[in-house]
């Protein structure tokens, strides 16, 4: 009997001892994989834990501080759908590291170590956000010298290029709950070199400025359109959004499994895969660098879609204090969407920001060097640190109340008065200020809608006057509209420092068809300028070249501005030309440097010339080349000849040529109404004759037709110029006879 009793007692004790492990073996609850050791939750918000389990089980989340004390807890029950979601109120942010235990019916099934609370942000966009830290200038230096980031910055990494293959299995129709291959780590981990360079510098800078742990959720993919990041229910509930998305919308019926889906552009695909799984986080805001893939579309389309994206993310992340704040990066210089596509998009960003100034900021990037690495192509500038740090600067003003410029300067209002366009800007800091001798980057147009380079002056701390002698009755002005805008030099200025450049600006979107890009050579202020139209080749190139002469940019040769062109003839006949092409060896072809311009809408071309020598010099002609090598020369205004004598008087002379009356390849008979021969200008050559010539050239400018552009477009020519040139030609031929 004693033996039996002893056996029963021993068996009971064994059962009691082993019961937890037996029970634990039957626990099926698990967290979604977006949670992990070393993670960060937004302070003072609900810290939500979600996953799957058996219906009816009680799931508890317990927060344990560094002393072992329970700091917070919350519980819920697994629902009929097999999903649980439990939460507790997150404590104030700080550097204390916590443990979170997840228990099912009292049994531990998950433990998260080294959890902190602070400021959590989401990063999103396409390739310029995705480009990894290791492909940035600073990142490469960090790799070389062993530098790492802060342990107080926590990164949620998700592989930017998972294997989608365009199938419904890999690009699901429904929002997902997990992200393949995701993980959390801090800034001291070697894996930081795989995260977004812009995101890294944003988070590191924000952490230092706030003196608070910062977390960053990653969500970007190169080449992606904005439509891919918007949830389906948002699209289907708003006909304007659905119309703006157009063919990128795909219904469930047509969500094919044959590999034809586009990861980059089809509506909701990337949202389902990379954003929806983050729904239980509570980010304080988002940094966004996207838009290149959406250039070349109608004005206003992107605004419609971005409004939808911001509204849907505000709901998704349960942001309670107005809209989810978003800091947007302007687009870098490149020819996506045409020569002016990127600048039109950034100009729309600027106007979009003013629709919701309390929740949006735009940072400008036009002054940041366009250094690049061949393996990441020229459209991905490698200087990511200034971009990320400017986003952190904007976030401090937008979200955290710092006395910063909240956004880069953008147009507040404009007024046409006394032959000038007056533009008033927001967010100028203490004042607008120019870097250099004069403001570069403004253009102006009349009723013909054709823009020409303009003069500009700051008339008050936030207002600029824009004008041109060649446009007497302006209709609109633009700023930083060209392909390469690094010469644009108007800045917000605060506390004795240049903060960032003014954003691309359009005063009237009705006048947007004939934008002139910054040729770089017309003001003769600089000897080198950055050029890029190739994905693999870009850099600083000479602005001018010569044949039979020495040429250099010199302040002593300036008529206006920082410099002019000093020309020393080495032969009796010589020429100077702007450099318009460079050779792309990889593709074995010439690349035109933001050139190949349509000059049909220009009526006159002028150049300032000074003869510093002792003998007269003749500008024999200006040769304007087409790509096929054929050339024409404009006649001197009011004359039937292409040449002009420059007297040796040491004075500046303005030589004006009529672009509507041209001599063909040296012939002496002019042709009337020949504007169509200027539809694709590939090169320009200024040809001179004179021994021991010593010239200064500066300020090459253009005058437009002045005829409303719809008339010219309809007829294909300028009727006023046609009549004038016919009369001039007849009179000239009579005199020649």
Describe each region flagged by the PLM:
Residues 512-729, 733-734:
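Beta-rich carbohydrate-recognition modules and glycan-binding surfaces
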Residues 1-4:
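Positively charged n-region of N-terminal signal peptides that target proteins for export
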Residues 8-16:
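Bacterial N-terminal signal peptides
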């Amino acid at each position: 009997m004693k033996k039996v009793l002893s056996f029963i007692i021993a068996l009971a004790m064994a059962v009691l001892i082993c019961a937890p492990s037996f029970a634990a073996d039957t626990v099926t609850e698990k967290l979604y994989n977006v949670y992990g050791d070393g993670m960060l939750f937004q302070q003072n918000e609900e810290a939500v834990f979600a996953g799957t389990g058996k219906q009816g089980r009680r799931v508890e989340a317990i927060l344990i501080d560094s002393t072992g004390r329970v700091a917070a807890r919350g519980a819920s029950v697994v629902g009929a759908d097999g999903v649980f979601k439990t939460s507790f109120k997150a404590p104030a942010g700080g550097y204390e590291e916590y443990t979170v235990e997840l228990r099912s019916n009292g049994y531990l099934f998950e433990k998260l170590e080294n959890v902190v609370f602070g400021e959590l942000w989401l990063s999103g966009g396409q390739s310029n956000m995705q480009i990894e830290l290791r492909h940035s200038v600073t990142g490469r230096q960090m790799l070389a010298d062993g530098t790492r980031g802060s342990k107080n910055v926590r990164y949620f990494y998700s592989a930017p290029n998972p294997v989608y293959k365009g199938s419904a299995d890999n690009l699901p129709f429904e929002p997902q709950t997990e992200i393949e291959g995701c993980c959390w780590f801090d800034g001291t981990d070697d894996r930081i070199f795989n995260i977004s360079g812009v995101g890294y510098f944003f988070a590191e800078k924000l952490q230092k400025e706030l003196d608070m742990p910062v977390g960053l959720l990653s969500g970007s993919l190169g080449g992606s359109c904005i439509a891919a990041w918007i949830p389906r229910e948002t699209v289907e509930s708003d006909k304007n959004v659905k119309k703006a998305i157009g063919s990128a919308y795909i219904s469930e019926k047509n969500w094919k499994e044959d590999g034809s889906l586009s990861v980059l552009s089809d509506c909701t695909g990337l949202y389902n895969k990379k954003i929806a799984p983050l729904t239980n986080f509570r980010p304080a805001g988002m940094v966004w660098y996207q838009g290149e893939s959406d250039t070349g579309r109608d004005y206003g389309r992107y605004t419609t879609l971005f409004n939808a994206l911001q509204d849907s993310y505000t709901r998704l992340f349960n942001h309670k204090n107005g809209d989810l704040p978003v800091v947007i990066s302007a687009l870098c210089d490149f020819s996506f969407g045409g020569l002016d596509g990127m600048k039109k998009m950034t100009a729309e960003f600027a106007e979009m920001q003013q629709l919701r100034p309390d929740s949006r900021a735009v940072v400008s990037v036009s002054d940041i060097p366009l250094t690049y690495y061949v393996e990441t192509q020229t459209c991905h500038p490698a200087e990511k640190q200034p971009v990320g740090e400017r986003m952190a600067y904007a976030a401090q003003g937008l979200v955290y109340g710092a006395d910063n410029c909240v956004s880069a300067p953008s147009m507040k209002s404009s007024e046409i008065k006394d032959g000038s366009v007056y533009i008033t800007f927001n967010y100028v800091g203490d004042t607008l200020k120019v870097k250099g001798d004069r403001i570069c980057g403004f253009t102006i147009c009349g009723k013909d809608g054709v823009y020409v380079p303009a003069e500009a002056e700051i008339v008050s701390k936030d207002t600029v006057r824009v004008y041109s002698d060649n446009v007497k009755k302006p209709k609109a002005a633009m700023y930083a509209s060209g392909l390469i805008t690094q010469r644009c030099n108007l800045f917000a200025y605060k506390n004795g420092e240049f903060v960032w450049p003014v954003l691309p600006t359009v005063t009237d979107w009705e006048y947007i068809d004939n934008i002139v890009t910054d040729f770089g050579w017309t003001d003769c202020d600089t000897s080198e300028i950055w050029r890029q139209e190739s994905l693999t080749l870009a850099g600083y190139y000479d602005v001018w070249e010569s044949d039979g002469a020495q040429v250099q940019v010199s302040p002593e040769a300036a008529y206006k501005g920082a410099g002019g062109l000093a020309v020393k003839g080495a032969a009796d006949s010589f020429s100077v030309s702007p450099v318009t092409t460079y050779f792309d060896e990889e593709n074995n072809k010439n690349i035109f440097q933001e050139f190949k311009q349509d000059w049909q809408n220009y009526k006159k071309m002028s150049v300032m010339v000074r003869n510093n020598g002792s003998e007269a010099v003749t500008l024999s002609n200006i040769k304007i080349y087409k790509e096929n090598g054929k050339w024409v020369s404009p006649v001197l205004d009011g004359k039937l000849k292409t040449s002009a004598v420059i007297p040796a008087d040491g004075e500046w002379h303005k030589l004006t040529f009529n672009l509507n009356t041209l001599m063909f390849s040296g012939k002496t008979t002019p042709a009337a109404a020949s504007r169509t021969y200027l539809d694709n200008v590939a090169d320009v050559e200024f040809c001179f004759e004179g021994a021991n010539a010593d010239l200064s050239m500066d300020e090459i400018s253009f005058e437009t037709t002045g005829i409303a552009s719809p008339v010219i477009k309809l007829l294909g020519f300028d009727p006023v110029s046609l009549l004038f040139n016919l009369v001039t030609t007849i009179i000239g031929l009579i005199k020649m006879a």
